[in-house]
């Protein structure tokens, strides 16, 4: 019989995704058939699953941790926030429409059947399913029709382990408060809790564990330290762009403007891991640094809206000066579209604005269309003559004179565009920096040595390290019951 456990947080960004990945790798290392599952995710960081649909990148990473192919059923409902049209709803890997907040609340009960179907598919043949909640079950204003947290747990009869983040402070209050606010039927689902992101002497929290026990009766299944290896994993939430230091004083500065609807920003993680690269996330109100050698414009879930905001920040003028100084620019997906001369949206897919002038750094135009390209791809860099792998998730078609200088071929067809002087390029291929040979060639063209590290191997070894740390700190009796 398949066992299941669900990790829910006392709030957002408490570390659930990493813990689920760590538990999946721990179970896989013990020889179990383990699968990750998240009923509902909200993220513009999407991946293309092995069966050809869209899922959250966290679930893609968790499938890697479990050493199993990724599937659309591991994340049956994915919400991708857009601009004034609310969120795009991805159901079992395919676009199912758009919905604003209240519309989605009304839609949720209708999605439960698909969620349970996917859970059944993921569970089939598995020894263990590790489920991840979303946000917090204490948001009782969203409890009616819930499919992300306790609504799913009660319907599927999956026991819950709460995760509290001690690093942000107030973890005792968050756990006790969650106990106080949950209705009795939800409270009964909680088997215990984990403390996450602890720094220092764990014994100093002994009295805290006792206090939580007095108020709630819940057992503590472990105090998890700050997992340093997690810094080598792809980040899921854009909140990390505000927190992570990405080096300073290095040989090459790479600037990344943080678009308001930034998507798939983990494209930058392999560059951040390079010893001689300083990755600078440029937030609204800041200028693009004058000493950057490369500017990367990342993906966007709302190209027209982000293009308007790009100009409002004055980044268009900064970028023009950067190119005049001899700097390089790479646009990925939505960032590629932004670099062109025009973006048209005749059907209003992104919103009410039908057309906008682009930055004009590439002689190309983009027209949005309802058909969405979603696929994993093998590619070849025509610029550097090396192979690479990645994926495509985009709407629209881009054409123009600079497409004659396509920087890559994807599955044998030309993709992207390059300016005549070679300083500006764009492509629809996500994940290109994760290919070690391409990254090394790119960095060499920018005057530094790099790309020697195997990025994918680094991610895999980080998962093993996290699993080993969890095995050392989690309650042994609970872990043995869970893993059998």
From Swiss-Prot:
Lineage of the organism: Bacteria, Pseudomonadati, Pseudomonadota, Alphaproteobacteria, Hyphomicrobiales
Limits of the GATase cobBQ-type domain: 251-438
UniProt keyword annotation of Transport present: no
Keywords: Cobalamin biosynthesis, Glutamine amidotransferase
Pathway: Cofactor biosynthesis; adenosylcobalamin biosynthesis
InterPro entries: Class_I_gatase-like, CobQ/CobB/MinD/ParA_Nub-bd_dom, CobQ_GATase1, CobQ_N, CobQ_synth, GATase_3, P-loop_NTPase
Signal peptide extent: none
An example molecular function term from Gene Ontology annotations: catalytic activity
Protein family (similarity comment): Belongs to the CobB/CobQ family. CobQ subfamily.
Pfam families per UniProt: CbiA, GATase_3
Domain of life the protein comes from: Bacteria
Protein name from the UniProt record: Cobyric acid synthase
GO biological process, one term: cobalamin biosynthetic process
PROSITE patterns: GATASE_COBBQ
Encoding gene, per UniProt annotation: cobQ
Stated role: Catalyzes amidations at positions B, D, E, and G on adenosylcobyrinic A,C-diamide. NH(2) groups are provided by glutamine, and one molecule of ATP is hydrogenolyzed for each amidation.
Organism for this UniProt entry: Sinorhizobium fredii (strain NBRC 101917 / NGR234)
Active site: 333 (nucleophile), 430
